[in-house]
Amino acid sequence: MHLQLNLCAILLSVLNGIQGAPKSINSKSCAISFPENVTAKKEPVYLKPSNDGSLSTPLQPSGPFVSLKIGESLAIFCPGDGKDVETITCNTNFDLASYSCNKSTSTDTIETEEVCGGSGKVYKVGFPLPSGNFHSIYQTCFDKKNLTPLYSIHILNGQAVGYHLKHTRGSFRTNGIYGKVNIDKLYKTQIEKFNKLFGPKQTFFRRPLNFLSRGHLSPEVDFTFRREQHATEMYINTAPQYQSINQGNWLRVENHVRDLAKVLQKDITVVTGILGILRLKSKKIEKEIYLGDDVIAVPAMFWKAVFDPQKQEAIVFVSSNNPHVKTFNPNCKDVCAQAGFGNDNLEYFSNYSIGLTICCKLEEFVKRNKIILPKEVNNKNYTKKLLKFPKTRNKEGDKKVVRKRAKGA
């Protein structure tokens, strides 16, 4: 396999007295340090052999280091390069040069025949494996008729939170799903559209904060590798969201979910969806808001359901997508305080200009809003227990949000 050599792409070295190496790693092993040692822009996929010998398990860190025992192997795979897989083995003379792919990061989108959400189909976003199987980074339930994602679902690795690789965001892609609709242009020309709809003096949509941004459903920072983060830059993984909310309480919700996964130190399942259509009143007439011509509806609310598969517990965060009103009705009782998200968040979650936000019990939210959950979490046991933040919580998500998203994120 002729992979482009890049000495700083990934450092795998024998841990003989390396400073800062965890004590749990044997001195006769090889280690990958995240994110410092994985710097290749044209990043390969790192695969660990499965029990049956097939290369069907993408590597995921279980902390700042991934260790290989002497004799263990790791495969370097470049989807779409059409080249063989390179197998590398950890040994006592381990001095491995790093590799990067010949082609830039790419992912595929596969439309399945599986119906979801009542009016959508399941789309898998990921890449093919050497085994012939397709590895899904996340899945989206997408309503192709109305060009609207109903929800996305992905796994958040709690042991990898905080060790994601730095990724420079690229352009959002349609992968041909939106047909002749130029969604990128619709976002860029939205102010002109709404000036025509409400008049040139309208105040519903104005920059720098009161405009519609591409609101991620499965957020890029929930993923470790650049290829995974790049995969989130799909329009089917976004819905129009006010920028003030996108970088306000919705970002705070995303931070809370990552904090929760980090404290639990295990995989959690995250389902993120939209609810209703935003209605704005002008001259006593309410109008439903669309980014396009009766397609790409602007949601009234965004919701994020978090599931602990081991304990079968769940919680739902719901945020208003209207920074102009002081109330909203998600049809469920606020249980933020009961779940451990209470007093610290009151100042922020009650601020309508950055997105009114509450926490809900799954059963109440799903039943009253007639939400059809994906089959992976459509288990009645989840409706019985509220997922709470442990008392030894990391309060990073409670602090004022200072991390800025990319422009138009």
From Swiss-Prot:
Q: Which family does the record assign?
A: Belongs to the DNA/RNA non-specific endonuclease family.
Q: Name the InterPro entries for this protein.
A: DNA/RNA_non-sp_Endonuclease_sf, Endo_G_ENPP1-like_dom, ENPP1-3/EXOG-like_nuc-like, His-Me_finger_sf, Non-specific_endonuclease
Entry GO MF terms: metal ion binding; nucleic acid binding; RNA endonuclease activity; single-stranded DNA endodeoxyribonuclease activity; toxin activity
Q: In which tissues is it expressed?
A: Salivary gland.
Q: What does this protein do?
A: Hydrolyzes single-stranded and double-stranded DNA with little sequence specificity. Inhibits contact pathway of blood coagulation in the host by preventing activation of coagulation factor XII (F12) triggered by soluble DNA. Modestly up-regulates expression of CSF2, CXCL1 and CXCL8 in cultured human dermal microvascular endothelial cells. At higher doses promotes host neutrophil recruitment at the injection site in mouse model.
User: Where would you say this protein principally sits, based on its record?
Assistant: secreted
Location in the cell reads: Secreted
EC numbers listed for it are 3.1.-.-
Glycan-linked positions: N37, N102, N351, N381
Question: Which residues act catalytically here?
Answer: H216 (proton acceptor)
Which residue windows are coiled coil? none
Entry protein name: Salivary endonuclease
One record GO biological process = apoptotic DNA fragmentation
Look up and give the organism this protein is from. Lutzomyia longipalpis
Whether Coiled coil counts among this entry's keywords is no
Can you name a GO cellular component term?
A: mitochondrial inner membrane
Q: Which SMART domains match?
A: Endonuclease_NS, NUC
Q: Fetch the Gene3D superfamilies from UniProt.
A: Extracellular Endonuclease, subunit A
- Give the pH-dependence text from the record: Optimum pH is 5.0-8.0.
Swiss-Prot/TrEMBL keywords: Blood coagulation cascade inhibiting toxin, Endonuclease, Glycoprotein, Hemostasis impairing toxin, Hydrolase, Metal-binding, Nuclease, Secreted, Signal, Toxin
